[in-house]
Design a protein with these regions (language model features):
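A short, surface-exposed loop/turn module that caps and links secondary-structure elements
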Residues: 33-59
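Enriched for short, Lys/Arg-rich terminal
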Residues: 2-18, 22-30, 50, 59-66, ...
């Protein structure tokens, strides 16, 4: 099985600090591990986003926060856009 490469935006790296401070690091790491193996694995469930984030996918960390990513299937890359709320 091919491992997917995870890349982070500057914003997602800032969000990682907030996630850690909020005590959600372990949950976020589980989601990142799933994305590294197979970003289309279900569960945990994911949603395709619309609007400003059209083409991106969302996975729930908790009721408020999400991991938002873009998936480049041909390159086997998962780009993490946000790891905090995307409702702001």
């Amino acid at each position: 099985m091919v491992k997917w490469k995870i890349v982070f935006t500057k914003q997602s790296l800032k969000d990682a600090k907030l996630i850690s401070a909020a005590g959600l690091r372990q949950r976020a790491e589980k989601i990142l591990a799933v994305l590294e193996k197979n970003p289309f694995q279900n569960p945990p469930p994911y949603e395709k986003l619309i609007g400003d984030l059209y083409g991106a996918y969302s996975r729930r960390i908790n009721i408020q926060h999400r991991v938002i990513c873009q998936i480049y299937d041909d390159l086997k890359i998962v780009k993490i856009i946000r790891m905090w709320t995307h409702y702001e």
